[in-house]
Amino acid sequence: MEAPAERALPRLQALARPPPPISYEEELYDCLDYYYLRDFPACGAGRSKGRTRREQALRTNWPAPGGHERKVAQKLLNGQRKRRQRQLHPKMRTRLT
């Protein structure tokens, strides 16, 4: 009589699938190549501020058409904060004023 391991072997071979065919890109590029393609600076010196394509995409106002609104809102908040500080701690008077 056959051993259980010998009987299970043909079933395992039938269940095992052949590896998927490798595409042209996967055959051509390895992990390091993909890293350089993704993270290499987008353009020449001086134009990208030393940022990679990925960093530029992460830190851009392009998706928000009103990206300048953040700057305007920050100016308003800073002005309100300064006004409150002046009310809490008025400037000391000097003899010159």
Swiss-Prot record:
Keyword Zinc in annotation: no
Any one Gene Ontology BP term: negative regulation of cell population proliferation
InterPro entries to which the protein is assigned, alphabetical: NUPR1-like (IPR018792)
GO-annotated cellular components: nucleus
Organism superkingdom: Eukaryota
Key words of the record: Cell cycle, Growth arrest, Nucleus, Repressor, Transcription, Transcription regulation
Induction: Up-regulated by p53/TP53 in cancer cells. Up-regulated by DNA damage stimulus or starvation.
Localisation per UniProt entry: Nucleus
Start and end residues of each stretch annotated as Disordered: 76-97
Bias (Basic residues) ranges: 80-97
One Pfam family matching this protein: Phospho_p8
Family in the record: Belongs to the NUPR family.
PANTHER family (alphabetical): NUCLEAR PROTEIN 1 AND 2 (PTHR17149), NUCLEAR PROTEIN 2 (PTHR17149:SF3)
Role according to the record: Acts as a transcriptional repressor by inhibiting gene expression at the NUPR1 promoter in a p53/TP53-dependent manner in cancer cells. Involved in the G1 cell cycle arrest, and in a decrease in cell viability and cell proliferation. Plays a role as a negative regulator of the protumoral factor NUPR1.
Protein name: Nuclear protein 2
